[in-house]
């Protein structure tokens, strides 16, 4: 899921798909409990969860979840059977993250409750992501990749299309009349694409 979401954000999409009984929805906030709110710590926890699986895995992530999934597929190409990246970035847009963090500073603490994060943790996490750039490592991804982006997701559509160009064995699908949170805005349409 994305930073402003939780695993329940996927319920409507999952209900519409034939998801494996062994599928798991991870909570990003729970993965950081008791740890520093940094991308490195979050990725370490995410990797640990993925490493628990004995067989190849299919990873599906939106926004921050897509960044984590892509990072894992780069580091463990033999472990990832397929990837679904929704509203994905492979090189963090520094200016956009700066603006986002400025807005986070202005928002009340209560606005962060549904995320499961404290305001300071969200600001810290976003700050540590500014330098992420997987451009030189994309060639390591060896599995099939479905890249999905909403038609109205101006911040991610261009990059998602670029990512499709850079990854071998990838396919881009644009969800019409949909913005950034495809799993919330168009769960039925997303479920069809995921089948």
Where are these regions (language model features)?
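Short beta-strand/loop motif that positions the catalytic acidic residue
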Residues: 140-141, 147-149
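Conserved acidic catalytic loop of the alpha/beta-hydrolase fold
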Residues: 40-57
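Hydrophobic, aromatic-rich cap/lid helix
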Residues: 110-134, 152
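Flexible "cap/lid" loop of the alpha/beta hydrolase fold
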Residues: 70-75, 80-110
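Gly/Ala-rich beta-loop-alpha elbow adjacent to hydrolase catalytic centers
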Residues: 61-69
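Conserved alpha/beta-hydrolase "acid-adjacent" motif
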Residues: 154-160
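Conserved HGGG/HGGXW glycine-rich cap/lid loop of the alpha/beta-hydrolase fold
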Residues: 1-33
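Catalytic histidine-centered segment of alpha/beta-hydrolase-like enzymes
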Residues: 178-187
């Amino acid at each position: 899921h994305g930073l402003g979401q939780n695993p329940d954000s996927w319920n409507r999409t999952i209900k519409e798909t034939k998801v494996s009984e062994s599928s798991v929805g991870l909570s990003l906030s729970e993965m950081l409990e008791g740890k520093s709110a940094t991308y490195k710590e979050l990725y370490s926890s995410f990797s640990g969860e993925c490493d628990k699986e004995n067989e190849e895995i299919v990873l599906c992530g939106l926004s921050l979840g897509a960044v984590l999934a892509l990072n894992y597929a780069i580091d463990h190409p033999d472990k990832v059977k397929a990837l679904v990246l929704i509203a994905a970035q492979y090189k963090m847009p520094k200016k956009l993250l700066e603006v986002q963090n400025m807005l986070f500073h202005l928002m009340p603490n209560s606005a962060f409750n549904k995320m499961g994060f404290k305001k300071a943790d969200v600001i810290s996490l976003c700050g540590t992501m500014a330098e992420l750039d997987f451009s030189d490592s994309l060639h390591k991804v060896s599995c099939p990749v479905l890249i999905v982006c909403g038609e109205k997701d101006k911040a991610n559509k261009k990059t998602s299309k670029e990512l499709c160009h850079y990854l071998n064995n990838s396919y881009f699908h644009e969800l019409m009349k949909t913005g950034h949170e495809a799993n919330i805005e168009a769960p039925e349409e997303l479920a069809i694409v995921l089948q």
